[in-house]
UniProtKB/Swiss-Prot annotation:
Lineage: Eukaryota, Metazoa, Chordata, Craniata, Vertebrata
Biased composition (Low complexity): 293-302
Comp. bias (Acidic residues): 445-454
Location of region: Disordered: 290-374, 445-464
Pfam families, alphabetized: DUF4647
Official protein name in the record: Uncharacterized protein C9orf43 homolog
Biased composition (Basic residues): 303-318
Ranges of biased composition (kind: Polar residues): 352-367
Organism domain of life: Eukaryota
Length: 464
Protein backbone atom coordinates (compact mmCIF):
# COMPACT_ATOMS: atom_id res chain seq x y z
CA UNK A 1 0.00 0.00 0.00
CA UNK A 2 1.57 3.25 -1.16
CA UNK A 3 0.87 5.96 1.40
CA UNK A 4 2.23 9.50 1.39
CA UNK A 5 4.56 10.70 4.10
CA UNK A 6 3.13 11.22 7.55
CA UNK A 7 4.23 14.85 7.42
CA UNK A 8 1.60 15.44 4.70
CA UNK A 9 -1.23 13.79 6.67
CA UNK A 10 -3.95 15.92 8.20
CA UNK A 11 -4.82 13.35 10.87
CA UNK A 12 -4.56 13.49 14.67
CA UNK A 13 -5.02 10.74 17.25
CA UNK A 14 -4.65 10.66 21.01
CA UNK A 15 -1.99 8.58 22.69
CA UNK A 16 -4.27 6.71 25.10
CA UNK A 17 -4.32 2.92 25.05
CA UNK A 18 -8.12 2.81 25.42
CA UNK A 19 -9.55 5.68 23.39
CA UNK A 20 -13.24 6.65 23.38
CA UNK A 21 -13.08 9.53 20.90
CA UNK A 22 -15.08 8.94 17.71
CA UNK A 23 -12.72 11.25 15.77
CA UNK A 24 -9.74 9.03 16.63
CA UNK A 25 -11.61 5.92 15.49
CA UNK A 26 -12.50 7.64 12.20
CA UNK A 27 -8.86 8.54 11.54
CA UNK A 28 -7.78 4.96 12.25
CA UNK A 29 -10.35 3.62 9.75
CA UNK A 30 -9.20 6.09 7.07
CA UNK A 31 -5.55 5.11 7.57
CA UNK A 32 -6.44 1.39 7.40
CA UNK A 33 -8.24 1.94 4.09
CA UNK A 34 -5.21 3.84 2.75
CA UNK A 35 -7.06 7.12 2.38
CA UNK A 36 -5.72 9.51 5.01
CA UNK A 37 -6.53 13.18 4.79
CA UNK A 38 -3.68 15.15 3.18
CA UNK A 39 -2.84 18.80 3.75
CA UNK A 40 -3.76 21.00 0.79
CA UNK A 41 -1.44 23.34 -1.07
CA UNK A 42 -3.38 26.37 0.20
CA UNK A 43 -2.82 25.34 3.79
CA UNK A 44 0.95 25.24 3.41
CA UNK A 45 2.59 28.17 5.15
CA UNK A 46 6.03 29.38 4.08
CA UNK A 47 8.85 28.92 6.53
CA UNK A 48 9.66 32.61 6.74
CA UNK A 49 6.06 33.74 7.37
CA UNK A 50 6.84 34.57 10.96
CA UNK A 51 9.43 37.14 9.86
CA UNK A 52 6.91 39.15 7.82
CA UNK A 53 4.72 41.88 9.34
CA UNK A 54 0.90 41.72 9.23
CA UNK A 55 -0.84 43.57 6.40
CA UNK A 56 -4.17 45.47 6.65
CA UNK A 57 -6.37 45.72 3.56
CA UNK A 58 -9.24 48.20 3.14
CA UNK A 59 -12.35 47.18 1.14
CA UNK A 60 -15.17 49.42 -0.12
CA UNK A 61 -18.34 47.92 1.37
CA UNK A 62 -20.73 49.82 -0.87
CA UNK A 63 -19.33 48.18 -3.97
CA UNK A 64 -19.58 44.68 -2.57
CA UNK A 65 -22.95 44.92 -0.79
CA UNK A 66 -25.14 47.03 -3.03
CA UNK A 67 -23.94 45.61 -6.31
CA UNK A 68 -26.52 43.47 -8.19
CA UNK A 69 -25.87 39.80 -7.60
CA UNK A 70 -26.89 37.03 -9.96
CA UNK A 71 -27.55 33.55 -8.70
CA UNK A 72 -24.91 31.26 -10.21
CA UNK A 73 -26.21 28.19 -11.95
CA UNK A 74 -23.40 25.84 -10.92
CA UNK A 75 -23.24 26.57 -7.20
CA UNK A 76 -23.84 22.96 -6.28
CA UNK A 77 -21.13 21.62 -8.59
CA UNK A 78 -18.58 24.14 -7.32
CA UNK A 79 -19.24 23.24 -3.73
CA UNK A 80 -18.92 19.58 -4.60
CA UNK A 81 -15.58 20.14 -6.35
CA UNK A 82 -14.09 21.65 -3.22
CA UNK A 83 -14.77 18.42 -1.37
CA UNK A 84 -12.27 15.60 -1.45
CA UNK A 85 -13.51 12.97 -3.90
CA UNK A 86 -11.33 10.37 -2.24
CA UNK A 87 -13.73 10.00 0.68
CA UNK A 88 -16.18 7.17 0.26
CA UNK A 89 -19.09 9.01 1.85
CA UNK A 90 -19.23 11.81 -0.70
CA UNK A 91 -18.52 9.47 -3.61
CA UNK A 92 -21.91 7.82 -3.14
CA UNK A 93 -23.73 11.08 -3.80
CA UNK A 94 -21.60 12.05 -6.80
CA UNK A 95 -23.80 13.27 -9.62
CA UNK A 96 -26.93 13.63 -7.38
CA UNK A 97 -28.15 17.04 -6.23
CA UNK A 98 -28.83 17.28 -2.48
CA UNK A 99 -32.45 16.89 -1.43
CA UNK A 100 -32.55 20.15 0.50
CA UNK A 101 -31.72 22.38 -2.50
CA UNK A 102 -34.32 23.13 -5.19
CA UNK A 103 -34.01 22.11 -8.80
CA UNK A 104 -32.54 24.41 -11.47
CA UNK A 105 -35.89 24.75 -13.17
CA UNK A 106 -37.45 26.03 -9.96
CA UNK A 107 -34.59 28.51 -9.40
CA UNK A 108 -34.74 29.98 -12.89
CA UNK A 109 -38.53 30.03 -13.23
CA UNK A 110 -40.45 33.23 -12.51
CA UNK A 111 -43.70 33.60 -10.57
CA UNK A 112 -46.45 32.61 -12.97
CA UNK A 113 -50.14 33.26 -12.44
CA UNK A 114 -52.40 30.20 -12.57
CA UNK A 115 -54.39 29.79 -15.74
CA UNK A 116 -58.04 30.67 -15.28
CA UNK A 117 -60.99 29.94 -17.57
CA UNK A 118 -61.96 33.01 -19.61
CA UNK A 119 -65.58 34.13 -19.71
CA UNK A 120 -66.95 35.78 -22.82
CA UNK A 121 -68.35 38.95 -21.28
CA UNK A 122 -69.76 40.24 -24.56
CA UNK A 123 -72.74 37.91 -24.32
CA UNK A 124 -73.54 38.75 -20.69
CA UNK A 125 -75.00 41.95 -19.33
CA UNK A 126 -72.92 43.18 -16.38
CA UNK A 127 -74.38 45.49 -13.71
CA UNK A 128 -71.34 47.85 -13.75
CA UNK A 129 -69.72 47.82 -17.23
CA UNK A 130 -67.13 50.45 -16.25
CA UNK A 131 -65.21 48.08 -13.90
CA UNK A 132 -64.96 45.18 -16.36
CA UNK A 133 -61.43 45.94 -17.55
CA UNK A 134 -59.46 44.91 -14.45
CA UNK A 135 -61.62 42.02 -13.30
CA UNK A 136 -61.07 38.27 -13.04
CA UNK A 137 -64.15 36.09 -13.27
CA UNK A 138 -64.28 32.65 -11.62
CA UNK A 139 -66.74 29.90 -12.43
CA UNK A 140 -68.05 28.00 -9.38
CA UNK A 141 -69.55 24.56 -10.09
CA UNK A 142 -72.95 23.65 -8.83
CA UNK A 143 -72.99 22.38 -5.23
CA UNK A 144 -74.67 19.05 -4.63
CA UNK A 145 -77.43 19.05 -2.08
CA UNK A 146 -76.64 17.12 1.11
CA UNK A 147 -79.57 14.90 2.07
CA UNK A 148 -80.33 14.91 5.78
CA UNK A 149 -80.60 11.73 7.79
CA UNK A 150 -84.05 12.48 9.12
CA UNK A 151 -86.63 12.27 6.34
CA UNK A 152 -89.39 13.80 8.42
CA UNK A 153 -87.83 17.27 8.56
CA UNK A 154 -88.12 19.60 5.59
CA UNK A 155 -84.86 20.50 3.84
CA UNK A 156 -84.03 24.17 3.70
CA UNK A 157 -82.21 25.48 0.66
CA UNK A 158 -78.81 27.16 0.99
CA UNK A 159 -78.08 30.70 -0.09
CA UNK A 160 -76.52 29.48 -3.32
CA UNK A 161 -79.60 27.44 -4.17
CA UNK A 162 -81.80 30.47 -3.50
CA UNK A 163 -79.72 32.59 -5.82
CA UNK A 164 -80.03 29.92 -8.51
CA UNK A 165 -83.79 29.78 -8.22
CA UNK A 166 -83.94 33.59 -8.22
CA UNK A 167 -82.05 33.69 -11.50
CA UNK A 168 -84.34 31.00 -12.90
CA UNK A 169 -81.62 28.46 -13.73
CA UNK A 170 -82.16 24.76 -14.34
CA UNK A 171 -80.54 22.19 -12.00
CA UNK A 172 -77.81 20.65 -14.16
CA UNK A 173 -77.36 23.27 -16.90
CA UNK A 174 -76.43 26.35 -14.97
CA UNK A 175 -73.56 27.39 -12.75
CA UNK A 176 -73.25 30.38 -10.46
CA UNK A 177 -70.69 32.99 -11.47
CA UNK A 178 -69.10 35.14 -8.80
CA UNK A 179 -66.76 38.11 -9.22
CA UNK A 180 -63.85 38.61 -6.83
CA UNK A 181 -64.85 42.22 -6.13
CA UNK A 182 -67.48 42.31 -3.34
CA UNK A 183 -71.11 42.88 -4.22
CA UNK A 184 -70.79 41.81 -7.87
CA UNK A 185 -72.76 38.94 -9.39
CA UNK A 186 -72.54 37.94 -13.04
CA UNK A 187 -75.67 36.34 -14.51
CA UNK A 188 -75.43 33.50 -17.05
CA UNK A 189 -75.39 34.22 -20.78
CA UNK A 190 -79.11 33.46 -21.22
CA UNK A 191 -80.93 34.60 -18.09
CA UNK A 192 -84.63 33.95 -17.65
CA UNK A 193 -86.20 36.25 -15.10
CA UNK A 194 -88.99 34.56 -13.19
CA UNK A 195 -89.53 36.95 -10.32
CA UNK A 196 -93.19 35.99 -10.20
CA UNK A 197 -92.28 32.89 -8.23
CA UNK A 198 -91.10 34.96 -5.27
CA UNK A 199 -93.95 37.41 -5.22
CA UNK A 200 -96.63 36.92 -2.57
CA UNK A 201 -99.31 36.94 -5.29
CA UNK A 202 -98.03 33.65 -6.65
CA UNK A 203 -98.73 31.78 -3.38
CA UNK A 204 -102.35 31.14 -2.42
CA UNK A 205 -103.72 33.01 0.56
CA UNK A 206 -104.64 29.88 2.53
CA UNK A 207 -101.03 28.60 2.36
CA UNK A 208 -99.73 31.93 3.64
CA UNK A 209 -102.29 32.27 6.41
CA UNK A 210 -101.53 28.84 7.90
CA UNK A 211 -97.83 29.62 8.18
CA UNK A 212 -98.37 32.98 9.92
CA UNK A 213 -99.38 33.51 13.56
CA UNK A 214 -102.95 34.53 14.27
CA UNK A 215 -102.13 37.90 15.87
CA UNK A 216 -100.24 38.97 12.72
CA UNK A 217 -103.14 37.92 10.51
CA UNK A 218 -105.58 39.96 12.60
CA UNK A 219 -103.41 43.04 12.20
CA UNK A 220 -102.89 42.60 8.45
CA UNK A 221 -106.35 41.34 7.52
CA UNK A 222 -108.92 43.30 9.51
CA UNK A 223 -111.62 42.21 7.07
CA UNK A 224 -111.81 38.46 6.61
CA UNK A 225 -113.58 38.89 3.26
CA UNK A 226 -110.45 40.11 1.47
CA UNK A 227 -109.15 37.65 -1.10
CA UNK A 228 -105.71 39.25 -1.65
CA UNK A 229 -103.29 40.42 1.06
CA UNK A 230 -102.48 44.08 1.40
CA UNK A 231 -99.11 45.72 0.69
CA UNK A 232 -97.94 45.56 4.32
CA UNK A 233 -98.56 41.84 4.41
CA UNK A 234 -96.51 41.35 1.25
CA UNK A 235 -93.58 43.26 2.75
CA UNK A 236 -93.68 41.31 6.02
CA UNK A 237 -93.89 38.01 4.18
CA UNK A 238 -90.81 38.89 2.15
CA UNK A 239 -88.90 39.92 5.30
CA UNK A 240 -89.81 36.71 7.11
CA UNK A 241 -88.62 34.59 4.20
CA UNK A 242 -85.26 36.33 4.10
CA UNK A 243 -84.60 36.01 7.84
CA UNK A 244 -82.92 32.79 8.86
CA UNK A 245 -84.46 30.67 11.65
CA UNK A 246 -83.16 30.99 15.19
CA UNK A 247 -82.39 27.29 15.49
CA UNK A 248 -82.33 24.25 13.25
CA UNK A 249 -85.03 22.53 15.27
CA UNK A 250 -87.37 25.48 14.89
CA UNK A 251 -90.78 24.36 13.55
CA UNK A 252 -91.92 25.63 10.16
CA UNK A 253 -95.14 27.04 11.53
CA UNK A 254 -93.32 29.29 14.06
CA UNK A 255 -92.20 32.07 11.74
CA UNK A 256 -92.23 34.92 14.26
CA UNK A 257 -89.68 35.04 17.07
CA UNK A 258 -92.36 35.49 19.74
CA UNK A 259 -94.06 32.28 18.73
CA UNK A 260 -90.78 30.37 18.75
CA UNK A 261 -89.86 31.67 22.21
CA UNK A 262 -93.24 30.69 23.61
CA UNK A 263 -92.81 27.14 22.25
CA UNK A 264 -89.31 26.98 23.70
CA UNK A 265 -90.61 28.10 27.11
CA UNK A 266 -93.31 25.43 27.09
CA UNK A 267 -90.78 22.71 26.32
CA UNK A 268 -88.61 23.84 29.22
CA UNK A 269 -91.55 23.66 31.63
CA UNK A 270 -92.21 20.00 30.81
CA UNK A 271 -90.08 17.74 33.06
CA UNK A 272 -90.02 14.97 30.45
CA UNK A 273 -88.16 17.22 28.02
CA UNK A 274 -86.03 18.90 30.67
CA UNK A 275 -84.50 15.72 32.07
CA UNK A 276 -82.85 13.10 29.83
CA UNK A 277 -83.50 9.39 30.22
CA UNK A 278 -80.41 8.81 32.34
CA UNK A 279 -81.46 11.39 34.94
CA UNK A 280 -84.97 9.96 34.93
CA UNK A 281 -83.67 6.52 35.87
CA UNK A 282 -81.58 7.94 38.71
CA UNK A 283 -84.57 9.92 39.97
CA UNK A 284 -86.79 6.81 39.93
CA UNK A 285 -84.17 4.76 41.78
CA UNK A 286 -83.86 7.43 44.46
CA UNK A 287 -87.62 7.63 44.98
CA UNK A 288 -87.94 3.82 45.18
CA UNK A 289 -85.12 3.61 47.71
CA UNK A 290 -86.72 6.36 49.81
CA UNK A 291 -90.06 4.54 49.79
CA UNK A 292 -88.46 1.25 50.82
CA UNK A 293 -86.64 2.99 53.66
CA UNK A 294 -89.90 4.52 54.90
CA UNK A 295 -91.65 1.14 54.80
CA UNK A 296 -88.81 -0.48 56.75
CA UNK A 297 -88.97 2.25 59.40
CA UNK A 298 -92.74 1.83 59.75
CA UNK A 299 -92.38 -1.93 60.18
CA UNK A 300 -89.76 -1.46 62.88
CA UNK A 301 -91.95 1.02 64.73
CA UNK A 302 -94.81 -1.47 64.67
CA UNK A 303 -92.51 -4.16 66.08
CA UNK A 304 -91.40 -1.80 68.85
CA UNK A 305 -95.01 -1.17 69.78
CA UNK A 306 -95.79 -4.91 69.80
CA UNK A 307 -92.83 -6.04 71.94
CA UNK A 308 -93.62 -3.92 75.04
CA UNK A 309 -97.25 -5.09 74.89
CA UNK A 310 -96.08 -8.72 74.91
CA UNK A 311 -93.81 -8.04 77.86
CA UNK A 312 -96.62 -6.44 79.85
CA UNK A 313 -98.88 -9.41 79.16
CA UNK A 314 -96.16 -11.82 80.29
CA UNK A 315 -95.68 -9.85 83.53
CA UNK A 316 -99.43 -9.90 84.21
CA UNK A 317 -99.53 -13.66 83.69
CA UNK A 318 -96.57 -14.15 86.03
CA UNK A 319 -98.33 -12.10 88.71
CA UNK A 320 -101.59 -13.99 88.29
CA UNK A 321 -99.87 -17.45 88.37
CA UNK A 322 -98.67 -17.38 92.04
CA UNK A 323 -102.22 -17.23 93.42
CA UNK A 324 -103.39 -20.10 91.26
CA UNK A 325 -100.28 -22.08 92.09
CA UNK A 326 -100.75 -21.58 95.83
CA UNK A 327 -104.31 -22.86 95.57
CA UNK A 328 -103.33 -25.77 93.33
CA UNK A 329 -100.65 -27.05 95.74
CA UNK A 330 -103.03 -27.90 98.58
CA UNK A 331 -102.83 -31.65 98.01
CA UNK A 332 -99.50 -33.46 98.20
CA UNK A 333 -98.18 -34.65 94.88
CA UNK A 334 -95.81 -37.62 94.67
CA UNK A 335 -93.65 -38.15 91.60
CA UNK A 336 -91.69 -41.35 91.14
CA UNK A 337 -88.92 -41.63 88.56
CA UNK A 338 -88.23 -44.94 86.92
CA UNK A 339 -85.19 -45.32 84.59
CA UNK A 340 -87.29 -47.33 82.13
CA UNK A 341 -90.62 -45.44 82.07
CA UNK A 342 -89.57 -41.98 83.26
CA UNK A 343 -91.82 -39.97 85.62
CA UNK A 344 -94.92 -41.66 87.07
CA UNK A 345 -97.64 -40.14 89.23
CA UNK A 346 -99.85 -41.80 91.74
CA UNK A 347 -103.51 -42.38 90.75
CA UNK A 348 -106.02 -39.65 91.58
CA UNK A 349 -103.56 -36.80 91.18
CA UNK A 350 -103.29 -36.33 87.41
CA UNK A 351 -104.67 -32.76 87.41
CA UNK A 352 -102.08 -31.53 89.90
CA UNK A 353 -99.30 -33.20 87.94
CA UNK A 354 -100.35 -31.48 84.71
CA UNK A 355 -100.21 -28.08 86.36
CA UNK A 356 -96.76 -28.84 87.74
CA UNK A 357 -95.49 -29.93 84.28
CA UNK A 358 -96.77 -26.67 82.76
CA UNK A 359 -94.89 -24.68 85.39
CA UNK A 360 -91.72 -26.69 84.72
CA UNK A 361 -91.93 -25.99 80.98
CA UNK A 362 -92.37 -22.25 81.58
CA UNK A 363 -89.40 -22.01 83.91
CA UNK A 364 -87.11 -24.03 81.61
CA UNK A 365 -87.96 -21.81 78.61
CA UNK A 366 -87.23 -18.67 80.67
CA UNK A 367 -83.92 -20.06 81.86
CA UNK A 368 -82.93 -20.97 78.32
CA UNK A 369 -83.70 -17.46 76.99
CA UNK A 370 -81.93 -15.53 79.78
CA UNK A 371 -79.19 -17.94 80.90
CA UNK A 372 -77.90 -20.18 78.11
CA UNK A 373 -76.53 -23.49 79.41
CA UNK A 374 -72.75 -23.71 79.02
CA UNK A 375 -72.20 -27.24 80.27
CA UNK A 376 -69.73 -29.45 78.42
CA UNK A 377 -69.74 -33.13 77.94
CA UNK A 378 -67.36 -33.62 80.87
CA UNK A 379 -69.84 -31.95 83.24
CA UNK A 380 -72.54 -34.33 82.06
CA UNK A 381 -70.21 -37.25 82.71
CA UNK A 382 -69.51 -36.02 86.26
CA UNK A 383 -73.19 -35.76 86.97
CA UNK A 384 -73.67 -39.26 85.56
CA UNK A 385 -71.26 -40.68 88.16
CA UNK A 386 -72.83 -38.77 91.04
CA UNK A 387 -76.37 -39.95 90.40
CA UNK A 388 -77.26 -43.21 92.15
CA UNK A 389 -80.45 -45.09 91.34
CA UNK A 390 -84.04 -43.89 91.10
CA UNK A 391 -85.17 -41.12 93.40
CA UNK A 392 -88.50 -40.26 94.99
CA UNK A 393 -89.57 -36.62 95.22
CA UNK A 394 -92.42 -35.48 97.32
CA UNK A 395 -93.79 -31.96 97.20
CA UNK A 396 -95.87 -31.11 100.20
CA UNK A 397 -98.22 -28.16 100.27
CA UNK A 398 -96.85 -24.94 101.66
CA UNK A 399 -99.07 -23.91 104.54
CA UNK A 400 -97.65 -20.43 104.65
CA UNK A 401 -99.67 -17.32 105.19
CA UNK A 402 -101.46 -16.03 102.12
CA UNK A 403 -100.69 -12.53 103.27
CA UNK A 404 -96.93 -13.10 102.71
CA UNK A 405 -95.37 -11.03 99.93
CA UNK A 406 -95.61 -12.37 96.43
CA UNK A 407 -91.85 -12.14 95.92
CA UNK A 408 -91.10 -14.71 98.63
CA UNK A 409 -93.53 -17.15 97.04
CA UNK A 410 -91.95 -16.66 93.63
CA UNK A 411 -88.45 -17.25 95.04
CA UNK A 412 -89.50 -20.50 96.70
CA UNK A 413 -91.13 -21.76 93.53
CA UNK A 414 -88.06 -20.84 91.45
CA UNK A 415 -85.78 -22.76 93.84
CA UNK A 416 -87.98 -25.85 93.63
CA UNK A 417 -88.14 -25.67 89.85
CA UNK A 418 -84.34 -25.36 89.64
CA UNK A 419 -83.96 -28.53 91.70
CA UNK A 420 -86.44 -30.38 89.50
CA UNK A 421 -84.72 -29.24 86.27
CA UNK A 422 -81.29 -30.14 87.70
CA UNK A 423 -82.42 -33.68 88.55
CA UNK A 424 -84.13 -33.99 85.18
CA UNK A 425 -80.91 -33.03 83.37
CA UNK A 426 -78.97 -35.66 85.36
CA UNK A 427 -81.49 -38.35 84.45
CA UNK A 428 -81.45 -37.40 80.78
CA UNK A 429 -77.65 -37.59 80.72
CA UNK A 430 -77.90 -41.09 82.11
CA UNK A 431 -80.58 -42.33 79.72
CA UNK A 432 -79.44 -40.31 76.67
CA UNK A 433 -81.18 -37.54 74.66
CA UNK A 434 -83.84 -38.38 72.16
CA UNK A 435 -83.38 -36.91 68.64
CA UNK A 436 -86.82 -35.24 68.65
CA UNK A 437 -86.15 -33.59 72.00
CA UNK A 438 -82.83 -32.26 70.72
CA UNK A 439 -84.51 -30.68 67.70
CA UNK A 440 -87.17 -29.08 69.88
CA UNK A 441 -84.54 -27.64 72.20
CA UNK A 442 -82.54 -26.17 69.29
CA UNK A 443 -85.65 -24.62 67.74
CA UNK A 444 -86.65 -23.03 71.05
CA UNK A 445 -83.18 -21.50 71.45
CA UNK A 446 -83.18 -20.03 67.92
CA UNK A 447 -86.66 -18.52 68.41
CA UNK A 448 -85.60 -16.92 71.67
CA UNK A 449 -82.44 -15.50 70.08
CA UNK A 450 -84.44 -13.99 67.18
CA UNK A 451 -86.84 -12.29 69.58
CA UNK A 452 -83.96 -10.84 71.61
CA UNK A 453 -82.20 -9.53 68.50
CA UNK A 454 -85.34 -7.85 67.20
CA UNK A 455 -85.97 -6.21 70.55
CA UNK A 456 -82.35 -4.94 70.79
CA UNK A 457 -82.48 -3.52 67.23
CA UNK A 458 -85.75 -1.78 68.02
CA UNK A 459 -84.29 -0.20 71.18
CA UNK A 460 -81.16 1.22 69.47
CA UNK A 461 -82.86 4.01 67.42
CA UNK A 462 -84.96 4.95 70.45
CA UNK A 463 -81.84 5.43 72.57
CA UNK A 464 -80.16 7.53 69.85
Amino acid sequence: MDLPDESQWDETTCGFAVCQHPQCWATVRRIERGRPRILGSTCKTPLDAEDKLPVLTVVNISDSCFAPRHLPECTVTKARSLLSRSSKFYSKFHGRPPKGLPDKSLINCTNRLPKLPVLNLNETQLPCPEDVRNMVVLWIPEETEIHGRQHGKKKRKNLTVKSKSFLGLSGNQSAVTRVETPGMTVPPPTPVQLSKQFSSDFLPLWAQSEALPQDLLKELLPDRKQTMPCLEMKIKLAMMKKNLPLERNRPDSAISSKMFLSIHRLTLERPALRYPERLKKLHNLKTEGYRKQQQWQQQQQQRKVKTPIKKQEAKKKAKSDPGSQSTSHKHPVTTVHDPLYGYRTLPGQNGDMKQQQQMEKGTTSKQDSTERPKMDYCDHVDFHHNVKGPELYETEPTNKDISAPVEAVLKAQAARQKKISFNFSEIMVRTGWNSELKLLRILQETDDEDEENQYSEAEKPLEE
